[in-house]
Amino acid sequence: MMKTSAIHSPFEAPNTISLVAGTGDAKNPLNAFDMSLLESGIGNLNLIRISSIMPPKADIIPLPKIPQGSLVPTAYGYQISELKGETVAAGISVAIPKDKELCGLIMEYECIGGKKECEDTVRNMAKEGFEMRGWEIDEIISIASEHTVENIGCAFAAAALWYK
């Protein structure tokens, strides 16, 4: 993991993005959600939920070492279920434009169902978002998680934005 310790203005656009996913199962919904955050590697951060825009020229990197308690801009999806045996999934995709001066799109999706269905859907959402803008896609990167509920289960996927 990269080490990061610089403090940044909340109005400075992040220049990296990391896709993460995890699952959790617990006795209550909040703990199931928390466990999925921990498994994804961002459980000790303060997530600030953002809309689905990737800053132009941001690099997609493995999750860096972010100081605990940091305020981290994050686009995410999650699905929680209390029905034992039910399968839940969450996915995130990032569509990167051919024109590197343009922003990218982050799409999130969650469902009762499997990882493949979820990831296919979230990738198609990214394609549609680019079609609506009339932009050409260079690449789509995605990740998804799937969980079969034992107590109360959660599937989680996110794009965490940070700084080099």
Swiss-Prot record:
Classification via InterPro entries: Pyr-dep_his/arg-deCO2ase, Pyr-dep_his/arg-deCO2ase_sand, Pyruvoyl-dep_arg_deCO2ase
Gene3D superfamilies, per the entry: 3.30.60.30, Pyruvoyl-Dependent Histidine Decarboxylase, subunit B (3.50.20.10)
GO BP annotations listed: arginine catabolic process
Reaction catalysis annotation: L-arginine + H(+) = agmatine + CO2
Molecular-function annotations in GO: arginine decarboxylase activity
SUPFAM superfamilies on file: Pyruvoyl-dependent histidine and arginine decarboxylases (SSF56271)
EC number: 4.1.1.19
Required co-factors: pyruvate
Family listed: Belongs to the PdaD family.
Protein name per the record: Pyruvoyl-dependent arginine decarboxylase
